[in-house]
């Protein structure tokens, strides 16, 4: 059982409306996996270690505030943003270099670590690649004993630019994106435009017989398989994603990105054993004085979910409605051998949404009413956020409970149906 889908997108001026950067991602994971949305405030740390999903690494003196969408069983994140409006999403990729099953840093750990430690997209590239060099990547990426492993690619953006970072073990290449749009799927996509790279990347490829040392170096051509079903499936979605971005080129907005993430015909909104278990859209104005707005579903299938806004302000409390139960040291992920059981990780919103989704699937009048009210709520929040995106935030206290309040409005939609 391998994922065929996972897609991350970014659009920059002049492709977007209003001098904004629009970031979006679907997290496509096992259909029974719960994805939570959690917030961690900025924090100063004493010298010591931080425990990631499988290993401990050196902690830094200060970590930035982050909002994350993540599989509820692990430490890292599939996607998220930080207080400096850096956004990151990662994808599984496979290539000629074998993925390591030994426990190290997961790609999802690297997403969180970069968000906690980097205040620009380029610095996030440096954080990830430095950690790769020191600790490596590897370990089981699913909550069972299957031993499912992969390399990672990352799409990273901030207020000014975006970066694509693609890895194969400790080797990597990175491409800067300063205008237009870019997307990544479950395949390597960096070719000859390489703006940063591992110092041994080309030498290693030559030693492996993947490159002759003379022809023009294309990271994708050298490090990819020549042909696999996974790459072919991802290639179809990669091209479809580009087409959907091109269709709205010049006026890409948050609504555009939400529509793309909901597109089932292209395979971007995944269904089946692997499905879109969580979705994110961020709107980042280029002007420093304007806030970024980060929308998360915290529920499966964006087509029947509500994108809810989050804004970084002081004193944001824990996001209790989208946080899964904590099992501490008794969690089967922490015990060895790992994954001997699977606890119920459903958070309050997931439980209520699960009931509502079943009603929607029945295709009756009640389900149609729920869907309409969900869309109305989302539209209302998009319109409300437009004021902050254009005028800034005068009273930040109004936004402290923004995400949680919106979840409670979503609860009301489900309760009234």
From Swiss-Prot:
Alphabetical list of Pfam families matching this protein: Peptidase_C69 (PF03577)
Gene Ontology MF, one: cysteine-type exopeptidase activity
Modified residues (Glyoxylic acid (Cys)): 6
GO biological process, one term: proteolysis
InterPro entries xrefs: Peptidase_C69 (IPR005322)
Family, per entry: Belongs to the peptidase C69 family. Secernin subfamily.
Name of protein: Secernin-3
């Amino acid at each position: 059982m391998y994922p065929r889908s996972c897609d991350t997108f970014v659009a920059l001026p002049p492709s977007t409306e209003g001098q904004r950067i629009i970031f979006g991602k679907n997290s496509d994971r096992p259909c029974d996996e719960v994805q939570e949305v959690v917030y961690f405030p900025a924090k100063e740390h004493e010298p010591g270690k931080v425990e990631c999903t499988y290993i401990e690494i050196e902690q830094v003196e200060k970590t930035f505030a982050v909002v994350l969408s993540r599989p509820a069983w692990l430490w890292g994140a599939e996607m998220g943003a930080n207080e400096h409006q850096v956004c990151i999403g990662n994808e599984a990729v496979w290539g000629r270099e074998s993925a390591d099953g030994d426990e190290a840093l997961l790609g999802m750990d690297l997403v969180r670590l970069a968000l906690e430690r980097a205040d620009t997209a380029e610095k996030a590239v440096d954080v990830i690649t430095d950690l790769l060099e020191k600790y490596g990547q590897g370990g089981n990426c699913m909550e069972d004993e299957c031993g499912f492993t992969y390399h990672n690619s990352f799409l990273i953006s901030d207020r000014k630019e975006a970066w694509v970072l693609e890895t194969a073990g400790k080797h990597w290449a990175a491409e800067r994106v300063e205008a237009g749009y870019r997307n990544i799927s479950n395949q390597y996509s960096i070719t000859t435009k390489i703006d940063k790279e591992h110092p041994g990347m080309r030498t290693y490829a030559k030693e492996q017989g993947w490159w002759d040392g003379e022809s023009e170096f294309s990271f994708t051509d050298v490090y990819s398989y020549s042909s696999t079903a996974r790459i072919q499936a991802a290639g179809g979605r990669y091209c479809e994603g580009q087409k959907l971005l091109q269709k709205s080129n010049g006026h890409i907005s948050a609504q555009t990105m939400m529509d793309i993430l909901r597109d089932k015909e292209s395979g971007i909104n995944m269904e089946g054993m692997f499905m879109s278990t969580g979705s994110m859209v961020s709107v980042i104005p280029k002007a420093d004085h304007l806030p970024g707005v980060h929308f998360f579903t915290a529920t499966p299938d964006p087509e029947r979910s509500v994108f809810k806004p989050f804004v970084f302000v002081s004193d944001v409390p824990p996001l209790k409605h989208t946080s899964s139960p904590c099992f501490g040291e008794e969690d089967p992920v922490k015990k060895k051998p790992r994954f001997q059981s699977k606890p119920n990780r459903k958070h309050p919103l997931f439980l209520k949404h699960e009931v509502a989704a079943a009603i929607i699937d029945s295709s009756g009048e009640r389900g149609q009413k729920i869907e309409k009210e969900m869309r109305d709520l989302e539209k209302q929040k998009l319109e409300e956020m437009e004021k902050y995106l254009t005028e800034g935030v005068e009273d930040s206290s109004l936004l402290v409970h923004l995400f949680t309040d919106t979840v409670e409005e979503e609860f009301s939609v489900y309760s009234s149906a």
